[in-house]
């Protein structure tokens, strides 16, 4: 695990910040997955692998500002995911798996569960409240990361 640098120290509450999310499965088209991570030095890494119709893996890396790391940390703190436990969540299966790892300050959590198709899967689980928090946090984080990646790679610099 990387240690916090200047970017990690600039987040509310101080200390290290690291986040990694993975969702994927192995099936008809091979190993298909989506993965992203925020590193303490501000590097955002993104990978999307789909072999459907012979697509190739998409990999993007970008450095984000301390304010972006603060926003990612705020999203996580407001979700209260750090209070949850994945013991009663569905185990990964042939449909796929999800992993979420977060380090904030001196707290470190790591969740593993199956792919969640819809809120019906959440409501019928043994821990619907905890899994609902996970489900919505993942939706928020994916939206945040997709926006950052799309903005960074589509916006052209202003020529003066």
UniProtKB/Swiss-Prot annotation:
GO biological process, any: mRNA processing
A molecular-function term among this protein's GO annotations: RNA binding
GO CC annotations, alphabetized: cytoplasm; exon-exon junction complex; nucleus
InterPro entries: Mago_nashi, Mago_nashi_sf
Tissue specificity remark: Expressed in root, leaf and developing seed tissue.
Localization per Swiss-Prot or TrEMBL: Nucleus; Cytoplasm
Keywords: Cytoplasm, mRNA processing, mRNA splicing, mRNA transport, Nonsense-mediated mRNA decay, Nucleus, RNA-binding, Translation regulation, Transport
Record-annotated membrane-spanning stretches: none
Induction remark: Induced by gibberellin, abscisic acid (ABA), auxin and brassinosteroid.
Subunit comment: Heterodimer with Y14A. Heterodimer with Y14B. Part of the mRNA splicing-dependent exon junction complex (EJC); the core complex contains MLN51/CASC3, EIF4A3, MAGO and Y14.
Family: Belongs to the mago nashi family.
Function of the protein: Core component of the splicing-dependent multiprotein exon junction complex (EJC) deposited at splice junctions on mRNAs. The EJC is a dynamic structure consisting of core proteins and several peripheral nuclear and cytoplasmic associated factors that join the complex only transiently either during EJC assembly or during subsequent mRNA metabolism.
PANTHER family in alphabetical order: MAGO HOMOLOG, EXON JUNCTION COMPLEX SUBUNIT-RELATED, PROTEIN MAGO NASHI HOMOLOG
Full protein name: Protein mago nashi homolog 2
Lineage: Eukaryota, Viridiplantae, Streptophyta, Embryophyta, Tracheophyta
């Amino acid at each position: 695990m990387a240690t916090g640098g200047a970017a990690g120290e600039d987040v509310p509450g101080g200390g290290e910040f690291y986040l990694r999310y993975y969702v994927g499965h192995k099936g008809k088209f091979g190993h298909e997955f989506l993965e992203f991570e925020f590193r303490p030095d501000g590097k955002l890494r993104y990978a999307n692998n789909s072999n459907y119709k012979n697509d190739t893996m998409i990999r993007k890396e970008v450095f984000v500002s301390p304010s972006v790391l603060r926003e990612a940390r705020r999203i996580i703190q407001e979700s209260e995911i750090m209070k949850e436990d994945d013991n009663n969540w569905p185990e990964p299966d042939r449909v796929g798996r999800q992993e979420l790892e977060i380090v904030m300050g001196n707290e470190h959590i790591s969740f593993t569960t199956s792919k969640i198709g819809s809120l019906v899967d959440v409501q019928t689980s043994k821990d619907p409240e905890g899994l609902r928090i996970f489900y919505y946090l993942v939706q928020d984080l994916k939206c945040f990361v997709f926006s950052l990646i799309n903005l960074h790679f589509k916006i052209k610099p202003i020529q003066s």
